[in-house]
Swiss-Prot record:
It comes from Campylobacter fetus subsp. fetus (strain 82-40). Its main location: cytoplasm. This is Acetate kinase. GO terms for cellular component: cytoplasm. Its cofactor is Mg(2+); Mn(2+). SUPFAM superfamilies: Actin-like ATPase domain. It is found in: Cytoplasm. Substrate binds at residue 89. GO terms for molecular function: acetate kinase activity; ATP binding; magnesium ion binding. Mg(2+). Can also accept Mn(2+). HAMAP family: Acetate_kinase.
Length: 399
């Protein structure tokens, strides 16, 4: 079976086509700058052949047409009939969805109702789904939500200590993000250690430009760092993470900033960028090595906040099998991994520096073998996880 995975952003479409008989990637591609006159489209086949084009792509509907054209011209497909299903990434499913679902009018309506909780993401996801269904309504489309894995959090974890009517009226609570990634790498970690996932407990660290951490007990998420939005939690590339909420009214009063301006600052002008001058950890480390004190401070703040969460999560999980690093920084930055694990020896976490420094693009253990808690690096593959969920939901619908 062939499954097409689509991730529609506000001005982009990323896609991957899988052969699910062996979970191999047939091709992958992206379309950028949708709405601009000089939009960019690219596809890469499994043999490494690349096709690119620049033309005006005014909207997502045209973007889907361009995607199909790329799929045909690259010979990844000869007909849309070859596609058995389409899986769509959806950032926010709130508490309306506790699993991936076949897309129908009711699902589209619910995703639209959740736009206030994800104003940058859900409209783009909707556009991708609607346009795909418009082209071939007979091909099953499945919505896979970033928030589903976090739906097992207990109420004590997801509620905020605010007036209860804010939750009842506006659904203000912790939803988390990166759930597809956290679940994927946790399952991979359990497989590496030969532990049944239902009896596997770990802490997963998705460290990229966006960063989050999750506490997983017996295969279920019981807490995560991101909240109502992806702004809460860890320090990130351009996001501040958790701060004193009183800073917002303070800035409104003393800096004469609007709520919208502060939201932009906290999402796009804070984090590593604000303190160290770059949202790229590689640049931060290069500046730090050159003697830049602000870059050093940014590095230390980033690590400290991760360690605080690890300590807190160990206290609520009790015994854990592993700490798992993933995403751009988590998978590739040995220096960050070593700094994060340094000082955690009291919890049975000890890094093997040689294994940690080795550069490999595969799941691997990097802790000392005699330690109680394993340290594992797992390259995340959210698209494959979406493809697997899509296939599962389609098969269930046939029973």
């Amino acid at each position: 079976m062939k499954i097409l995975v689509i991730n529609s952003g506000s001005s982009s479409i990323k896609f991957k086509l899988y052969d699910m008989s062996d979970e191999s990637v047939i091709c992958k591609g992206l379309i950028e700058q949708i709405g601009a006159k000089n939009s960019y489209a690219k596809i890469v086949t499994k043999t490494g052949e690349i096709a690119e084009k620049r033309e005006e792509i005014p909207d997502h509907g045209t973007g889907i047409d361009v995607m199909n054209e790329l799929l045909f011209n690259s010979h990844a497909l000869t007909s849309l009939d070859e596609i058995d299903g389409v899986g769509h990434r959806v950032v926010q499913g709130a508490d309306l969805f506790n699993d991936a679902v076949l897309v129908d009018d009711d699902v589209l309506q619910k995703i639209e109702e959740l736009i206030p909780l994800a104003p940058l993401h859900n409209p783009a996801h909707l556009a991708g789904m609607k346009e795909t269904l418009k082209v071939r309504p007979d091909i099953p489309n499945v919505a896979v939500f970033d928030t589903v894995f976090h739906q097992t959090m207990p109420k004590s974890s997801y509620m905020y200590p605010l007036p209860i009517e804010f939750y009842e009226k506006y659904k203000i609570r912790r939803y988390g993000a990166h759930g597809t990634s956290h679940q994927f790498v946790a399952k991979a970690g359990a497989k590496i250690l030969g532990v049944d996932f239902d009896h596997f407990s770990c802490i997963t660290l998705h460290l990229g430009n966006g960063a989050s951490i999750a506490a997983i007990k017996n295969g279920k998420c019981i807490d995560t760092s991101m909240g109502l939005t992806p702004l809460e939690g860890l320090m990130m590339g351009t996001r501040c993470g958790s701060i004193d909420p009183a800073i917002v009214p303070f800035l409104m009063k003393n800096a004469n900033l609007s709520g919208e301006e502060i939201d932009t600052i906290m999402n796009k002008k804070s984090g590593l960028l604000a303190i160290g001058g770059s949202n790229d950890m590689r640049e931060i480390e290069a500046r730090m090595d050159a003697g830049d004190e602000n870059a050093k401070l940014a590095f230390e703040m980033f690590v400290l906040r991760i360690k605080k969460y690890i300590g807190a999560y160990i206290s609520i999980l009790g015994e854990i099998n592993a700490i798992i690093f993933t995403a751009g920084i988590g998978e590739n930055d040995a220096r960050i991994r070593e700094a994060v694990c340094s000082g955690l020896e009291i919890f049975g976490i000890r890094m093997d520096k040689d294994k940690n420094a080795a550069k490999k693009d595969e799941p691997r253990r990097v802790g000392l073998p005699e330690t109680k808690v394993r340290i594992i690096i797992v390259p995340t593959d959210e698209e494959l996880a979406i493809a697997e969920d899509t296939l599962r939901i389609i098969n269930q619908s046939k029973k």
